[in-house]
């Protein structure tokens, strides 16, 4: 076999292993909210407690997403990628065998580390295995796999709950991850970055977790403890102290988790906040609707019906994704971001008007509006994050925005769950019917998401004009994947700062 054929076969193996594993990770992540009522029924753990299966995943992912990429650069990308796959298999088996909510949550937190490692190192492996146009095609396919996985997850989860029980998703994912491990072992060549200093910012990783964990704990327990209780304020104090310590550490380490100098870039800061808001609101929405649609006092959907109910939103994302780069190139990146968040805000405002008489048909248009708005804002925001910095800083900017996605998902889901549960409890205590209390909880949480989305509109004014992506197939894939990962676009290479356009 010639060297060219061997190289092509190896590159194909890398592409298959990384794309399949990414699709599985994202499908698993987006499916879990649909599974929560079934897990709650089997384990006897309240849905409110099980929200940690969602927020815990994102919390750990936020701490690990950048570090795992650094570990791959230093110790070998193939080695760390396979470690991520192994952890993913272990977490799936642990969750599938779990008899308690605590084990499910623990498994999901392990899965957060595994998923972040697979995403970070998988993209690095693709970049190393290909160059030029082949690299663009490979990254485009990876982005498409990420988007398809995230979109298909809720429907897949709903189907499997009805057919195999909620455990089926995790057994299937474990099997696919094992196959990816074998494929990686056979086809992927080890690589590392010999020019990178062999130091890892472990302190920064720990401090990110110490910043987020008490923050989310304080938010989720505030309804029981009180917002101004010693416990809640203590959690917030620990979070603030850890945040300050993180900033101090990042200013001193040789290779920081977060390059603080990047925070002087207005476009990067604005786009990162926009990315955080977008990821937070879409994850908060999926959590809320998964519970509301399946509650017997609300729409009483089966898991399959709840999964099918997300299809219009998925279709909205799929339809808008190829159009976003061209739209951004024509209107301008920040204008597209602003219009997208305005549409999302409008959708949440409509959902905020929900009452117990609503059928699914009443949710249809606002859900599509939210999804299309997300698709319009996330792609250009991701493009702006990397196009606003020099070529040498693209990796750092991408790391910042990807960390922001996990942070947004963790914090917004915790806030949405807290508001939803608190309002339901208060309404029930005041004598409201279960259906009215549920509708009031969803309305209150939706208004909160609307406020966050409106902040995204304001971020569009913070972001300076920048050169938008030109509308290549790679840009379309990047836009489609933007609610899960920041990918390079045609506006990224060789950038040195914001530009008119």
Regions found by a protein language model. Give the residues of each.
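Flexible interhelical linker loops that connect adjacent transmembrane helices
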Residues: 3-12, 133, 181-209, 251-269, ...
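C-terminal membrane-cytosol helix-exit motif in multi-pass small-molecule transporters
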Residues: 135, 174-193, 209-221, 238-253, ...
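A residue-level signal for alpha-helical anchor/packing sites in multi-pass solute transporters
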Residues: 39, 124-125, 129, 159, ...
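Helix-loop interface residues and adjacent transmembrane-helix termini in multi-pass membrane transporters
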Residues: 8, 44, 74-77, 97-98, ...
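Intrinsic disorder in cytosolic terminal tails and internal cytosolic loops
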Residues: 1-10, 194, 463-501
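12-transmembrane solute porter fold
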Residues: 11-27, 32-34, 47, 203, ...
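Interfacial helix-cap and linker-helix signal at transmembrane-aqueous boundaries
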Residues: 39-40, 71-72, 156-164, 219, ...
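Transmembrane-helix bundle of Major Facilitator Superfamily
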Residues: 1-186, 323-324, 339, 345, ...
